[in-house]
Amino acid sequence: MATEIAKHICCGIDCNNEADRLQCPKCLNDGVKSYFCGQECFRNSWNIHKHLHRPPNVEKREDGTYNPFPKFHFAGSLKPVYPLSPIRKVPPHIKRPDYAKTGVSRSEQIEGRSFKLKRLTPKEQEGMRKVCRLGREVLDAAAAAVRPGTTTDELDSIVHNACIERDCFPSTLNYYAFPKSVCTSVNEIICHGIPDQRPLEDGDIVNIDVSLYHNGFHGDLNETYYVGDKAKANPDLVCLVENTRIALDKAIAAVKPGVLFQEFGNIIEKHTNSITEKQISVVRTYCGHGINQLFHCSPSIPHYSHNKAPGIARPGMTFTIEPMLTLGPARDITWPDDWTSSTASGRCSAQFEHTLLVTETGCEVLTARLPNSPGGPLK
């Protein structure tokens, strides 16, 4: 009697097909079962799937975790704790951005060849309001779990599931091969931290950067949270986090029709220069961005003074302001995962971000905190 071959769900990016025979040979060598529905799906998924593999000559700890980059000179004490969890699935009924399967946004590449500043129609503005409200709910769900002992991978699971519950696609998932559904940046990590198995510790700070896609629109927001009472009692961290929060608030207060995009950086750096108790610097490598039907588009919003960003705010435009400030100098390095950005000094960094809609008289903070949102300024 013939036996029926057991069916598995394909491990490929954005694929929910059944798979039976084809397995990743590297996973087989590591004793891991990962099935794919075909060679094309395996090839398309490789840039993310490879993060699940333990590099040769890397020893596992007793708990099965390991540092995938043992020869890299990390600037601070933070190191990645692998293996990463398997790629999380998105149900097929949820609408996807154009890069969900390939990792490459062709629509963003086309837009990038021209400097177009889109002004949304009233209907499109409602689409942005909806996705940003959902984004706030998702961020708050993750923030409620921030405590010593929670891993950043657990935060990723919370964000992913909260997105799915709201019929949203997590915008970071497979965006140019980013392997997770949220960015979690701890201590000296400036941005784009990949969630892994490291538990948060009392005294850490963690930035949770949520981006999601709903009914054709992206929303984007982040906040930095204190982990435990030890962090809240650290004067360096409090100075850094609270001044980053204030710098964003001051920039938002200046958003109105007719303001040059370059002006927001002047406001942010003027505030950081006024801080006398600590040296705090503005990161120049990363900037805010336009956002609408595209995840990233024009305009660019640098956060430092005397920048040359072109363009003027007009009613109907939507964009983010998301300053990253560091203790000490602002030079940054990138980990070998090609995503994680760390301060070169190993000192801590903080960030806050909102998505904004320019109105006739000022702006609307589409991702504004709710009365019961976790975190917030220290009293």
From Swiss-Prot:
CDD domains for this protein: MetAP1
Enzyme Commission number: 3.4.11.18
Keyword Disulfide bond: no
InterPro entries in the cross-refs: Creatinase/aminopeptidase-like, Pept_M24, Pept_M24_MAP, Pept_M24A_MAP1, Zfn-C6H2
Ligand binding (Zn(2+) 2): 24, 27, 49, 53
Binding-site positions, Zn(2+) 1: 10, 15, 37, 41
Catalysed reaction equations from the record: Release of N-terminal amino acids, preferentially methionine, from peptides and arylamides
Zn-finger (C6H2-type) residues: 7-60
Cofactor note: Binds 2 divalent metal cations per subunit. Has a high-affinity and a low affinity metal-binding site. The true nature of the physiological cofactor is under debate. The enzyme is active with zinc, cobalt, manganese or divalent iron ions. Has high activity with zinc; zinc cofactor is transferred into the active site region by the zng1 zinc chaperone.
Ligand binding (a protein): 192, 296
GO (cellular component) term, any one: cytosolic ribosome
Sites bearing Phosphoserine, chain numbering: 373
Broad class of enzyme this protein falls into: hydrolase
Oligomeric form and interacting partners: Associates with the 60S ribosomal subunit of the 80S translational complex.
Family note: Belongs to the peptidase M24A family. Methionine aminopeptidase type 1 subfamily.
NCBIfam families, alphabetized: met_pdase_I
Entry protein name: Methionine aminopeptidase 1
Species of the source: Schizosaccharomyces pombe (strain 972 / ATCC 24843)
